[in-house]
């Protein structure tokens, strides 16, 4: 029974750091502005639909405030894109 041993050669490289190059790269990064890669959700109109069913709403006497019962759903956000894409988000 024999063993085969192999040693892989690893290459080591050194990079000389130049502060002038670093400053140039940093300034270039600060000046550039990132534009959106897509126009998706750029022209979004949100419509919030509230549950106004009085059956799900309990008014607290004397305070003028109210609370929703446990069976009431939260608000629904309906999003319609100008390109026709529609989404519904139930909170």
From Swiss-Prot:
GO terms for molecular function: RNA binding. It comes from the Eukaryota. Pfam families: DUF5547. This is Uncharacterized protein C2orf15.
């Amino acid at each position: 029974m024999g063993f085969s041993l192999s040693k892989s050669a690893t290459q080591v490289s050194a990079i000389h750091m130049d502060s002038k190059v670093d400053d140039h790269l940093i300034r270039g990064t600060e000046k550039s502005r990132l534009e959106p890669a897509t126009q998706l959700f750029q022209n979004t109109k949100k419509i919030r639909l509230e549950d106004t069913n009085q059956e799900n709403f309990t008014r607290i006497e004397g305070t003028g405030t109210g609370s929703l019962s446990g069976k009431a759903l939260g608000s629904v956000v309906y999003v319609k894109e100008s390109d026709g894409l529609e989404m519904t988000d139930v909170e």
